[in-house]
Amino acid sequence: MATEGAAQLGNRVAGMVCSLWVLLLVSSVLALEEVLLDTTGETSEIGWLTYPPGGWDEVSVLDDQRRLTRTFEACHVAGAPPGTGQDNWLQTHFVERRGAQRAHIRLHFSVRACSSLGVSGGTCRETFTLYYRQAEEPDSPDSVSSWHLKRWTKVDTIAADESFPSSSSSSSSSSSAAWAVGPHGAGQRAGLQLNVKERSFGPLTQRGFYVAFQDTGACLALVAVRLFSYTCPAVLRSFASFPETQASGAGGASLVAAVGTCVAHAEPEEDGVGGQAGGSPPRLHCNGEGKWMVAVGGCRCQPGYQPARGDKACQACPRGLYKSSAGNAPCSPCPARSHAPNPAAPVCPCLEGFYRASSDPPEAPCTGPPSAPQELWFEVQGSALMLHWRLPRELGGRGDLLFNVVCKECEGRQEPASGGGGTCHRCRDEVHFDPRQRGLTESRVLVGGLRAHVPYILEVQAVNGVSELSPDPPQAAAINVSTSHEVPSAVPVVHQVSRASNSITVSWPQPDQTNGNILDYQLRYYDQAEDESHSFTLTSETNTATVTQLSPGHIYGFQVRARTAAGHGPYGGKVYFQTLPQGELSSQLPERLSLVIGSILGALAFLLLAAITVLAVVFQRKRRGTGYTEQLQQYSSPGLGVKYYIDPSTYEDPCQAIRELAREVDPAYIKIEEVIGTGSFGEVRQGRLQPRGRREQTVAIQALWAGGAESLQMTFLGRAAVLGQFQHPNILRLEGVVTKSRPLMVLTEFMELGPLDSFLRQREGQFSSLQLVAMQRGVAAAMQYLSSFAFVHRSLSAHSVLVNSHLVCKVARLGHSPQGPSCLLRWAAPEVIAHGKHTTSSDVWSFGILMWEVMSYGERPYWDMSEQEVLNAIEQEFRLPPPPGCPPGLHLLMLDTWQKDRARRPHFDQLVAAFDKMIRKPDTLQAGGDPGERPSQALLTPVALDFPCLDSPQAWLSAIGLECYQDNFSKFGLCTFSDVAQLSLEDLPALGITLAGHQKKLLHHIQLLQQHLRQQGSVEV
């Protein structure tokens, strides 16, 4: 029993403690009541004013708790003459509002039921009315009291929830009889039975107020009146303290903002605008009932401090811990190779010998410089050498390893470690490094321009992001080198002699400078479908060689170098030849046999006979027709060998063409991700390609799903076969195809920024003229490369050019033939429109339109003109005007590409040279040339705005595509067209228009606006 009693006692104690905590918790958030007037428990005379005298009686009664209290009573129902109404007023003393904006009143009262009073005639009430009146000063004693209703503002009519029967069986005309205070026998209920009502009124604006109660025929007793205002209590939350705040005077739905103060070592949270630290102070809102709500913002602990006691305080990080940014996260241990010797550390300093780069975040570990590179060696290549080395043993804990090469020229043989001892000096300017001398990412460099038989010391330094912070010089390794010019020069060209399905015979002339007796030649070859590092070599003592064991229908690259007693010379340029498809007979090119070593008379006779035979065959073929009558189209260039472009449409089976011209990819290596656009054959998706043993790369994937027509499949694969034949830094690269399973897929490199036209429209005015020239130069270089294969693009436009994250422009949509002459009419040359004849010259015309698109930031060529209007303008030899801000030199180049006579248009190599000159000498962009040397061409005017339909500068800005400045115009009061027409270039920065492209565009349209207003005679400009 004792144990049970103890347990019960413990439970009661625990319950009391829990209740106490709940009470404390609730009291911390409950509203505060500031009392303005309270008659509860009053036992002495209150002395409020009544009208008429005797209408209300102040008496002492027992309340519902049997406590004696002063009350005001009115009960004149039974004694009133029949047909007369009651109008009894009771007014409080003057009540100071003490800063309250709204007052609340809580009434304790009792009402007798009319049915218990025996009163008839409708003069009995069970309600009374509550009023209030504001005043700056209390009423003077001698002032005439006026109870006129106009002086009072009604609060509400108060009705009892319960009315009670009379305490005696008979009614009385006196209130004292109705509310008699007398002895009560045992068991009899004493005191009054009460109703409690609460009302509020406001807003209060004067010094104080009176409250009045109007009785119109009730039998009631006012037991207690409590006037008070609500106040939100002082509170601490979100690391901010908020002061005690008066509730709003407009009622429960209105809010009063309170500004908080951050606790020690805390700061306001960011506003979310621009990510700036140190936002606005936090705010909490007090409603009309004295309750906090709607928190805006807050505070957070400063760097080096973490939350404590929930969200009430910020304490310093202990030693060994740190916090780098403001926020409410806890402190963290110091990163590797760093420490925090003092409390409140925002960052951990690095240990001696270790550093943190300026770009490293505070949470990054401290790192050190790398050790020296290892195992330097070199290969002599004529007057140049290829220097190799291995990675340092220690990388310092970083991944941004770079290499610098230091070159020293010495007078005699030097040891690398000696540093020259004063006999070595920096290499001459003629020595050059490929790709560069400093900041190398690969462990090799080609050093050229070295003098023969001169000793050099090449030193390779290993550096990373913290090397500059170290007081010690970078760790380096050095090697002695020497070169000789006695090796032969490069073999200038390689020719194909014959080919079969599994072999190719090639020949070549001697180097221009043999520099001694040629001992032999080394031929290097590789399959174009494979990586160049997987090449093979063979040695020939003559200037001809046959390569066997090749794959049918594959394209191979060839290079040759000669060897003398001094060593190998450099390789010559690469040329590409293709083996015959399986089953075709060996192809001989006798006209090339003149290059085969041998001069006997029988060979000469054979050459003569073969030449006559070839001429006859060529003559017959020309008579039968021209065009793409062979699978293999060739273009000869002196000194460059033979270039081939294979038309896949000549294959009966498109899959055979794609297998010969592109690399097949296993679908298991492909991961398809989200949709990034729409192509000619459906959705284009981003994906990942990771062949076995190779690095993963992002690709664009276009798939042709099952059910497509055979002609659609041929077109789909044919375009990939065309793209796979070209390798150029400004042409979209084909990564592979999937033809052995479904769906068919074509994989190309991923171009992050999409088509050039939409890219420019999204970044209008953000590039300099030279940057735009560089973009055009890249496209022109790609077209020069394509034209060297006699390949015609047919649909060149800014939309057919893609842009990657490095702003490199790459030509795409190869093999996408326009569907009819009206397609892409805005980019088509006159001969294409008239006869459907596509040539490289027509591509030059289209390139000129592309130039105009670039300089206008993706503007639609010929604006909103209809296709018939465009056709008429071209036939009448009208040409596009320069876009706003376009340098004259660039527009003249556009006009050259739009020559009606296609023979007078420049070639792409001339365009590339012109762009190179502009980049080297930017002043040539502004050169207009001699007008007399150029044909006079009429220029189109942009489609004029319909000014009568534009009712404001805001609408005008929208019409010209600059609606982003509408708020700027409104802010500076530019409300009429006359105001806008007065603007000049100097005014635009003040309006917030700082982009050069936007300034030029706006000034151009202001000139058009001025012309319109001159015609209307409404403004002087």
From Swiss-Prot:
Residues involved in ATP binding: I676, G677, T678, G679, S680, F681, G682, E683, V684
Residues annotated as signal peptide: 1-31
Domain Fibronectin type-III: 369-486, 487-582
GO molecular function: ATP binding; ephrin receptor activity; signaling receptor activity; transmembrane-ephrin receptor activity
Ranges where the record places region Disordered: 163-182
GO biological process: axon guidance; ephrin receptor signaling pathway
Expression tissues: Expressed in brain. Expressed in non invasive breast carcinoma cell lines (at protein level). Strong expression in brain and pancreas, and weak expression in other tissues, such as heart, placenta, lung, liver, skeletal muscle and kidney. Expressed in breast non invasive tumors but not in metastatic lesions. Isoform 3 is expressed in cell lines of glioblastomas, anaplastic astrocytomas, gliosarcomas and astrocytomas. Isoform 3 is not detected in normal tissues.
Keyword Secreted belongs to the record: yes
UniProt cross-references to SMART domains, sorted A to Z: EPH_lbd, Ephrin_rec_like, FN3, SAM
Glycan-linked positions: N480
Residue ranges annotated for the Eph LBD domain, each copy included: 33-237
Role, per record: Kinase-defective receptor for members of the ephrin-B family. Binds to ephrin-B1 and ephrin-B2. Modulates cell adhesion and migration by exerting both positive and negative effects upon stimulation with ephrin-B2. Inhibits JNK activation, T-cell receptor-induced IL-2 secretion and CD25 expression upon stimulation with ephrin-B2.
Self-association state and partner proteins as the record states: Interacts with CBL and EPHB1. Interacts with FYN; this interaction takes place in a ligand-independent manner.
Protein name, entry field: Ephrin type-B receptor 6
Organism: Homo sapiens (Human)
Gene it is expressed from: EPHB6
